[in-house]
Amino acid sequence: MPTITLPDGSQRSFDHVVSVADVALSIGAGLAKATVAGKVDGKLVDACDLIENDASLQIITPKDQEGLEIIRHSCAHLVGHAVKQLYPTAKMVIGPVIDDGFYYDIAYERPFTPDDMAAIEQRMQQLIEKDYDVIKKVTPRAEVIEVFTARHEDYKLRLVEDMPNEQAMGLYYHEEYVDMCRGPHVPNTRFLKSFKLTKLSGAYWRGDAKNEQLQRVYGTAWADKKQLAAYIQRIEEAEKRDHRKIGKRLGLFHTQEEAPGMVFWHPQGWTLYQVLEQYMRKVQRENGYLEIKTPQVVDRSLWEKSGHWANYADNMFTTESESRDYAIKPMNCPCHVQVFNQGLKSYRELPMRLAEFGACHRNEPSGALHGIMRVRGFTQDDAHIFCTEDQMQAESAAFIKLTLDVYADFGFKDIELKLSTRPEKRVGSDELWERAETALASALDSAGLPYDLQPGEGAFYGPKIEFSLKDCLGRVWQCGTLQLDFNLPIRLSAEYVSEDNSRKNPVMLHRAILGSFERFIGILIEHYEGAFPAWLAPTQAVIMNITDKQADFALEVEKTLAESGFRAKSDLRNEKIGFKIREHTLLKVPYLLVIGDREVEMQTVAVRTREGADLGSMPVAQFAEFLAQAVSRRGRQDTE
């Protein structure tokens, strides 16, 4: 009979087979009531599952991340229960867990409306109040097919067909509703009280636009009402910071249907873009990078050699001219190898760091496009380092330091790092992989940085480091990448002459810091809610006259600041000064300079901030010095 070992090392012996729920009850009634599921010998199981042999057991409650994900998964099933009661002809598809929530894809004769979503949520609440048990039945394959055939659940039957080797499957019963799942799920609907449906969207069966369209119902679920309220508050704050709304309000950019996934940059937005580009160009130049420019449209033959034509063709825009096939480049790496290959290199010329602000295009699904965060046309701060194996660690360490310095300049100090190591299918010897992984790990260790190890998650051609930054709302954005590549230099015949006069393939380090300018600008807009630090602000100062008598001096101030390298403009409109101040405050201009008769007489400007602080009057030269100091701090003033 089983002896159960608990996480604290204590043991409990039973003279009969027990379920996870039985063990929880033997510890205490409170724990039994809170039990969502169990983890037996490291495997998640339902609370009703039996333990027949000696095992380790962790009781899973809503306080555990696994418990929260189980609650969310069960809420997806609850969506199915409610939908089938309200819309009996609907056919259920899949309902997985996602970050902070869940969704369910549903086939129905018409699109769901916000009123439908409200009705589904209300019915879910009514079902939760019934406090019913969720019943699990491990069911033979033939019987599963009978169950879903009788219910006309065509998509469930297709999913069964996808699992030809599964002879028994878990069916979970919510009263009259039944769903199929590996589980585990909550034992009772009382765990599902803290949920909310959040949005509706379209989707496609198996994610393929060629297949039938489905309705997707999104929701979130939490362990308690307090967590749910905090999440809703974060979402409301995120909606206030939506880069699409702020971008329109501040006149930064727009998108339109005639060019899906492409950005129309307006003067203010393009100024911001250029500030980023000029900053990154300076950073790269100071760190030994050589800037290059490569073609946008490249013959199919190069993409075949690189492997992109075979593995990435669906994401590439292609064209034809004079009986030749071309692709608009989706990435820059093959072209950078062509630059490296011009003239045989010596080991003395390595490392060679080639950088490009490379415009790329990828045929992303239209449903996945999102403002400037997910686009089809974008520019990467892309670079490739060609080096020897002995140089991998030093180059990696230098890049890590550079990346963190850049993020700090933009105001991001909370950075998460992940090291992904060799997958089962890979190219290159184990010895080379060992050296590469050790190089990346040592580079991270030498920087004193904690990181998450992700075994088996590397690309087939080399290990990688991912850099993710946290914004002011605690959201995590994966931006930077350092990817070692043993494969592409071989495929594209990149070689150098080594110290012993033999020819060797260099190691290629793919690296990006911002990722893409478009997405990074979107992150900045939402992080700062459009109130950029002075060094990034498209307009750093606006000069406003009170009456026409001060117009000439206002123009002089604008000229002086512009000649000092600042982005300043005058507002000489015949409007009340309060109106002008309010308008430019809403446009998030960092500094508002007011000029009246006294300022003309004293040759000064009255300085206000967009936050409403009155900095008093000062000579123009003094303000220029003040602004220069603010610009020099970049985004660090709020983080140090």
From Swiss-Prot:
Subcellular location(s) per record: Cytoplasm
Cofactor binding mode and count: Binds 1 zinc ion per subunit.
Disulfide bonds: none
GO molecular-function term, one example from the UniProt record: metal ion binding
Keyword presence, Phosphoprotein: no
Database matches in Gene3D superfamilies: 3.10.20.30, 3.30.54.20, Anticodon-binding domain, Bira Bifunctional Protein, Domain 2, Threonyl-trna Synthetase, Chain A, domain 2
Domain TGS: 1-61
A Pfam family annotated for this UniProt entry: tRNA-synt_2b
EC number: 6.1.1.3
Region described as Catalytic: 242-533
Source organism superkingdom: Bacteria
Record's GO cellular component terms: cytosol
Binding-site list for Zn(2+): 333, 384, 510
Reactions mediated catalytically: tRNA(Thr) + L-threonine + ATP = L-threonyl-tRNA(Thr) + AMP + diphosphate + H(+)
Gene Ontology biological-process annotations: threonyl-tRNA aminoacylation
Principal subcellular localisation of the protein: cytoplasm
Keywords recorded for this protein, A-Z: Aminoacyl-tRNA synthetase, ATP-binding, Cytoplasm, Ligase, Metal-binding, Nucleotide-binding, Protein biosynthesis, RNA-binding, tRNA-binding, Zinc
PROSITE patterns with a match to the protein in the record: AA_TRNA_LIGASE_II, TGS
Cofactor(s) recorded in Swiss-Prot or TrEMBL: Zn(2+)
Family of the protein in this entry: Belongs to the class-II aminoacyl-tRNA synthetase family.
Function per UniProt: Catalyzes the attachment of threonine to tRNA(Thr) in a two-step reaction: L-threonine is first activated by ATP to form Thr-AMP and then transferred to the acceptor end of tRNA(Thr). Also edits incorrectly charged L-seryl-tRNA(Thr).
HAMAP family in the cross-refs: Thr_tRNA_synth (MF_00184)
Record text on subunit structure and interactions: Homodimer.
Record-given protein name: Threonine--tRNA ligase
Organism: Pseudomonas savastanoi pv. phaseolicola (strain 1448A / Race 6) (Pseudomonas syringae pv. phaseolicola (strain 1448A / Race 6))
Source taxonomy: Bacteria, Pseudomonadati, Pseudomonadota, Gammaproteobacteria, Pseudomonadales
Gene transcribed to yield this protein: thrS
